Each structure stands twice: as structure tokens, then as C-alpha cells.
Regions:
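Sec-dependent signal peptide recognition
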Residues: 1-7
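N-terminal signal peptide c-region/cleavage motif recognized by signal peptidases
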Residues: 11-13
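Active-site neighborhoods and metal-handling regions in enzymes and metal-associated proteins
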Residues: 15-409
């Protein structure tokens, strides 16, 4: 297993694919405009028994996929620190780039590349004229450096970088669209394969196999395929249950392509036909989603409260249909309506305010009624445009008639 993973890592590109190489220094230049101190970011630590996935903020600023690197920035300087070559490790993981390689500047996109042994001396030099030290507050390696400058003010690197990541570039949007197209194909393949008696994990396998075939290297998150009683469990991902006729199945599955995610959910009947009650609940969720999407545009309010997209969806659900006791259905819509999508499937910032052109978000209302074993969620990934929005996953049908024509056929 270790040798196999080593071979895989040996052929993996050190630099992020799909984003123009000159976009990364442009991102750093934009960050430096608001940087009033020293920023230090550490690449994610290596794990030789798992697929290596770079820390998203580090990847966003550097495009660098390999472990062991460190980024240090001020308003005027940016330096990438790389570990030295380890000949023994290279037997397992392939040739790494050494900070002393002749072509290191071309390969990294940094004019200044130093060995990791120079971190402390460089840090002490940079903080002489810097009032703050910006790092990710959960990083123990950064804490060790900060201990060298106990009188300096601490800054939050995550907050600064989140502002940049909120708006997507054309290249980022293209990768999210690629992931979305592959995910649409995966959902359709699962619908065609759907039948009573199959297990949830079999449907999940059809979906992952399909989007891997479209050039996506991994799932953006653990696939959720929840049937019957599992359809009312929001983040159910065990996918172990046998699906039976007469049930609905919530399929919340999305691909990741060249590090960028998408997020898509559809709810379909296992036997290809909604019951009258399932159809009623489904149509209410679909109506709520359409109402919210119709209001997506720059300036639209996120979060909770009057006038927000969340309230639009809630009001629709709460004024259409009743539960078995005659009460409104709003209490069964128990989660947020939206989040950002990008390098992370839940991209920063965590707190969403007014929408801006260039944001990529989800719209995902749901109703979950445990006493009826009916859970319905409909989710699309959406680009906010200058005059409204574009549904990046809009090629995946969601009308009842379209679904019933495709499931199991």
C-alpha cells in the first residue's frame, strides 16, 4: 500500500492544474494591499497512508500541492520555503523539488525560494518592521514562530484570505462548471441504475465511477445516499441500507475537479414513481428553491431574518402544505439555505452577507419528516452574475415528470 501511494504521489503534479500560473502571484499581490504585518502559512502535513490534499488557503495563494512548504509574506516581500530533498523518501514518493534546484523559480512561481532551515532568521528579520503576525490560529507550527515575537499583535490570516476567496475568477468558475457537469452525469447514471433491492453504496459507487471518468480526481465530500428513514438524516453517509420500492432517496453527491468542488442534491423515488404524498412534499421544496433562486442577484441578503433568501424559502414552505397533524411544514426545514462553494465545498467566509457578482453559492431547501420517512432536499450550485444568476448544475432535471421518466429507465 505504501509503495502504491508513493507511485501515485510521484506522478502527481506539484503545481495546481486548471488555474493560470500567473493568477497565484496576482492573488498574493491583492492580499499584500491589506497586509500590515508578516503572514505565515504552513502547507498541510504529509500523511503517507492517505491521499494528500493541500491546505486550501495555502493552495489558493501558492498553487503548491506538495507537503512541507511554508509561505511568508509582507506588504513588500513573498518567500516560499521548501524542505530539502530526502533521497530515502523519494524511493517511496518520487522526486521532490529542492530549494536549490536551478529551475525552482520557474516551477514555483516565486522569485524568492529558500530552504526551510532559513525560516527563523527570515522571520526575525521581517518582524523588525511589522506590527502584526498573521497566521491560521489552529496551526501549532505558526505558534512556535509567534513565540519568538511575544510582543507583536496577532492577526487572523484566515479572515484576510477569506475575503479574496469569496469572489471567483473565470478560471475558478470554469473548474466548478467542469465539476458540475461531471456531477450531473453522475446523478443521471445513478438514476438509470436505480432499482428496488439495491444498496445505497451501490448507487454511490455508480456516481463516483462516473465523475472519475469525466476527469474529476475525487469526491468533494462524502457521498450521501439516504433512502427511506435515512432520507431524513441530513448528513447521513454510511450508505449501507437496502433501498425498497415506495421510498425516496436523497442523493447529495458532488465531484471535485482540479481542487474545485460542486454541490448537488436531488431526491428521487426508488421505483421511479413518487407517491401522492411524496410528490406533494417534493413540489413544495421545489417551489421554495425556485422562489429563492429567482431572488438571487447582487445585493440579495443572506443569513437569517426578514428579506433574506432563507426567509423566502422558509415562508414558501411554511405556507404550502401541512404535516399529519395539520401544522405548517416550516418546522421541518431545519438547516441553512446556502453556503459558498470553491476550493472547499463549504467555502469561506462562513458568515454570508449580501451577495456579490462572482460568488458561487448553493440554494438547498429541504423538508424532513421523520414520522413519515420522507426527506426531500433539492440543491444546485449557482453563480451570482451582474444581473442575476446562472445555475451551474441546471442541466440536471428536477421536475417531477422529468425525474419519473428517467429513474430506472
Amino acid at each position: 500500500m505504501r509503495v502504491l501511494l508513493g507511485l501515485l504521489l510521484a506522478v502527481a503534479p506539484a503545481f495546481s492544474e486548471g488555474i493560470p500560473k500567473d493568477e497565484f502571484p496576482a492573488r498574493r499581490a491583492e492580499l499584500r494591499k491589506s497586509l500590515d504585518g508578516v503572514l505565515v502559512l504552513f502547507a498541510k502535513a504529509d500523511d503517507d497512508l492517505r491521499d494528500y490534499i493541500q491546505e486550501p488557503n495555502f493552495l489558493y495563494l501558492t498553487g503548491w500541492r506538495e507537503p512541507g512548504a511554508v509561505l511568508m509574506m509582507t506588504a513588500n516581500e513573498e518567500i516560499l520555503f521548501l524542505p530539502p530533498r530526502n533521497r530515502t523518501a523519494e524511493i517511496f514518493y518520487g522526486r521532490s523539488i529542492d530549494p536549490n534546484d536551478a529551475d525552482v523559480f520557474e516551477k514555483t512561481g516565486f522569485k524568492a525560494v529558500l530552504p526551510k532551515s532559513a525560516i527563523e532568521t527570515t522571520f526575525l528579520r521581517l518582524i523588525e518592521n511589522a506590527p502584526k503576525i498573521y497566521s491560521e490560529r489552529t496551526d501549532s507550527q505558526a505558534e512556535k514562530l509567534e513565540a519568538l515575537a511575544p510582543l507583536h499583535e496577532e492577526g487572523n490570516a484566515t479572515a484576510l484570505i477569506s475575503k479574496l476567496r469569496e469572489l471567483k475568477s473565470p478560471a475558478e468558475i470554469a473548474l466548478i462548471q467542469k465539476a458540475s457537469d461531471a456531477t450531473v452525469a453522475a446523478h443521471l447514471a445513478a438514476w438509470h441504475a436505480m432499482k428496488s433491492g439495491e444498496y445505497e453504496y451501490q448507487i454511490a459507487a455508480v456516481m463516483t465511477y462516473t465523475y472519475f471518468g469525466f476527469g474529476c480526481e475525487r469526491s468533494a465530500y462524502a457521498p450521501i445516499v439516504g433512502s427511506g428513514p435515512n432520507s431524513v438524516v441530513l448528513h447521513y453517509s454510511a450508505n449501507k441500507r437496502r433501498m425498497d420500492a415506495g421510498e425516496v432517496v436523497v442523493m447529495d453527491v458532488g465531484a471535485e475537479c482540479s481542487d474545485y468542488a460542486t454541490d448537488v442534491t436531488r431526491t428521487v423515488p426508488v421505483n421511479g414513481k413518487f407517491s401522492a404524498r411524496q410528490k406533494e412534499i417534493y413540489e413544495i421544496v421545489l417551489g421554495a428553491q425556485k422562489a429563492a433562486i429567482a431572488a438571487v442577484k447582487p445585493g440579495a441578503k443572506m443569513g437569517r431574518g426578514a428579506g433574506t433568501l432563507q426567509q423566502i424559502a422558509f415562508d414558501y414552505i411554511n405556507t404550502h402544505g401541512k404535516d399529519l397533524h395539520g401544522a405548517p411544514l416550516g418546522k421541518y426545514f431545519v438547516h441553512g439555505l446556502s453556503h459558498n462553494v470553491g476550493l472547499d465545498v463549504h467555502d469561506p467566509p462562513a458568515r454570508m452577507e449580501d451577495l456579490k457578482a462572482g460568488m458561487v453559492i448553493t440554494i438547498e431547501p429541504g423538508i424532513y419528516i421523520p414520522e413519515e420517512n420522507i426527506g426531500v432536499r433539492i440543491e444546485d450550485t449557482i453563480l451570482v452574475t451582474a444581473d442575476g444568476c446562472k445555475i451551474l448544475t441546471g442541466a440536471l432535471p428536477k421536475e417531477v415528470g422529468e425525474i419519473e421518466r428517467l429513474v430506472g429507465k
